[in-house]
C-alpha cells in the first residue's frame, strides 16, 4: 500500500505555515480535505490558512506543500488511523469514538487510494478549487530529485 510522507526542501513551509505550523520532514501525511476552509465569501488575501495548497501531518497536524508517495506497511497505516482518531476526538470534538474512527478510516483510505494512482517515490502537490458545491483537487506530479545517494 502507498501513502504520503512530508518533503521539506528548506524552511519555506515553516514560514508559509507559521500560523498552523509545518509538518516535519518524513512525517506521514493525509490529503487533509477534512480541514479545508470555506473559501466562499472570503477574499484570496484573507484566506491565509493555506488549506487549498497543502497536506496535513498526522503527528503534529502541521501543513506541508510537497508530499512523496511511498510504501506504508499495515502497522504504520493503523497507527495513522489511530492518530487521526485521537485528533478528531481531542482537537476537533468528534461526538463519539465511532464517528471519529469512521472519519479517520475514510481519510486514510482516501489518501491511500489517491496514492495508488501515482508511482512510488514521486513528489506531488495539491491545488484545491471550489466548484459545483464541492472542493475539487488537482495534483501535480514531479520526479523525486537525487544527488548521489541523497534525496532532495
Label every model-predicted segment.
Residues 1-67:
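N-terminal accessory interaction module
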Residues 68-74:
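A ubiquitous short alpha-helical element
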Residues 76-84:
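Short acidic alpha-helix initiation/capping motifs at coil-to-helix transition points
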Residues 90-105:
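Short, surface-exposed acidic
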Residues 101-152:
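Alpha-helical oligomerization segments
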Amino acid at each position: 500500500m502507498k501513502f504520503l510522507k512530508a518533503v521539506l526542501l528548506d524552511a519555506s513551509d515553516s514560514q508559509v505555515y507559521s500560523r498552523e505550523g509545518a509538518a516535519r520532514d518524513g512525517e506521514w501525511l493525509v490529503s487533509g480535505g477534512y480541514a479545508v476552509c470555506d473559501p466562499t465569501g472570503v477574499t484570496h488575501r484573507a484566506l491565509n490558512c493555506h488549506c487549498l495548497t497543502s497536506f496535513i501531518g498526522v503527528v503534529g497536524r502541521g501543513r506541508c506543500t510537497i508530499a512523496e508517495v511511498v510504501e506504508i506497511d499495515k502497522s504504520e497505516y493503523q497507527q495513522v488511523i489511530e492518530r487521526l482518531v485521537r485528533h478528531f476526538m481531542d482537537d476537533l470534538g468528534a461526538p463519539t469514538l465511532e464517528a471519529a474512527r469512521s472519519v479517520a478510516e475514510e481519510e486514510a483510505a482516501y489518501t491511500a487510494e489517491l496514492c495508488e494512482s501515482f508511482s512510488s517515490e514521486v513528489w506531488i502537490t495539491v491545488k484545491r478549487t471550489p466548484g459545483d458545491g464541492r472542493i475539487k483537487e488537482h495534483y501535480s506530479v514531479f520526479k523525486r530529485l537525487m544527488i548521489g545517494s541523497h534525496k532532495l
